Amino acid sequence: MQLKKIFFPIGGGEELAERIHGALLVNKFFGTHINIMACQLDPKMIYNVRMTLKGGVLMEEFLKSAGDEMRAEREVIKAIFDAECAKLGLDQNDDDHVPNSAALRHMVGIRSELVEKYSKYCDLVLVSVPPTGSITGTFEAAVTKSGKPCIVIPRKL
């Protein structure tokens, strides 16, 4: 089996830099392209904001605050990704056909549903061990619902 494309969904929790580093190391070993997917929930998806907050000003402040937090989280993930790619000498490229390259994709939605959907477009799924050892929705979607071979890496190397 020749691998061309690896998919790594970033789950929740700590050890973000360690997990990205581990995923990029596996990618470098195989000489493939890796798509790293970071997911965030849109506050409008999980709350009926109009029912939770009465009044337009409070709702707008809530959505602005949530949007600011989402942007800050994306910036942190991007900075870690950039640093780890530079450290390992991997090119950042959105083209899936470039070997020894990586791409970071930020998605908005329910993580387990996005993982199940996008994991079907790769040759290998890479997933990190859930933080508590209990199976999470992201882990289950990556391992059992993708239909692809899977490598599980530790959260800390």
Task: Identify the role of each PLM range.
Residues 1-61, 145, 156-157:
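Small/aliphatic-rich secondary-structure junction motif
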Residues 11, 107-110, 130-131:
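Structured loop/turn residues at secondary-structure junctions
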Residues 16, 112-157:
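Gly/Ser-rich helix-loop-strand patches that form or flank binding pockets
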Residues 32, 86, 148:
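A short helix->loop->beta-strand "cap" motif at the edges of active sites that frequently abuts
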Residues 35-37, 105, 126, 151:
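Hydrophobic/aromatic beta-strand patches that form the interior of the parallel beta-sheet core
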Residues 41-44, 52, 68, 75, ...:
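Structural beta-alpha unit
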Residues 58-75:
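A short acidic, glycine-rich active-site loop
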